[in-house]
Curated annotation (Swiss-Prot):
PANTHER family: MANNOSE, PHOSPHOLIPASE, LECTIN RECEPTOR RELATED. Belongs to the snaclec family. Residues 24-152 form the C-type lectin domain. The lineage of its organism: Eukaryota, Metazoa, Chordata, Craniata, Vertebrata. It comes from Deinagkistrodon acutus (Hundred-pace snake). It is found in: Secreted. One of its GO terms (molecular function) is toxin activity. Keywords: Blood coagulation cascade inhibiting toxin, Calcium, Disulfide bond, Hemostasis impairing toxin, Metal-binding, Platelet aggregation inhibiting toxin, Secreted, Signal, Toxin. SMART domains: CLECT. It holds the Pfam family Lectin_C. This is Snaclec anticoagulant protein subunit A. Anticoagulant protein which binds to the gamma-carboxyglutamic acid-domain regions of factors IX and factor X in the presence of calcium with a 1 to 1 stoichiometry. Also inhibits platelet aggregation by binding to platelet glycoprotein Ibalpha (GP1BA) and functioning as a blocker of vWF. Is devoid of hemorrhagic and lethal activities. Possesses antithrombotic and thrombolytic activities. Also hydrolyzes the Aalpha-chain of fibrinogen. Does not affect the Bbeta-chain and the gamma chain. It comes from the Eukaryota.
Length: 152
């Protein structure tokens, strides 16, 4: 009896220590660092892609890339899931006009903590570029229709 309790307690400790390490993503989404991601092949404008992401899952937005590890994960996800991407794939970064001052922030409202620009230009919406293995950010016209990645 004592051995059963000891083994049961040990299994409970292992379960509890592992239960917080991955996001609780549905089967069609991929998990990385506690967040869920899904790449979509259909082409949408930046605004339509952002709207689509918010309707997919509670807390969903276009992807916010906050580290080089996350950039590598997203690039790999795009390469796996969106083989038809011609030039670029939308991410959640966009220039916002706030009280006549332009600020760049992620569509989920978070500030930029990691940067990976190809070059800064005057266009307002950003995507990851195919020529860089979908790792570098580049400005594109917001009305272009392209694939995208959602994050929750």
């Amino acid at each position: 009896m004592g051995r059963f309790i000891f083994v049961s307690f040990g299994l409970l400790v292992v379960y509890l220590s592992l239960s917080g390490t991955a996001a609780d993503c549905s089967s069609s989404w991929s998990s990385y660092e506690g967040h869920c991601y899904k790449a979509f092949k259909q082409s949408k404008t930046w605004a339509d892609a952002e709207s689509f992401c918010t309707k997919q899952v509670n807390g969903g937005h276009l992807v916010s890339i906050e580290s080089s590890g996350e950039a590598d994960f997203v690039a790999h996800l795009i390469a796996q899931k969106i083989k038809s991407a011609k030039i670029h794939v939308w991410i959640g970064l966009r220039a916002q006009n706030k009280e006549k001052q332009c600020s760049i922030e992620w569509s989920d409202g978070s500030s930029i903590s990691y940067e990976n620009w190809i070059e800064e230009e005057s266009k307002k919406c950003l995507g990851v570029h195919k020529a860089t293995g979908f790792r570098k950010w580049e400005n594109f016209y917001c009305e272009q229709r392209d694939p995208f990645v959602c994050e929750a």
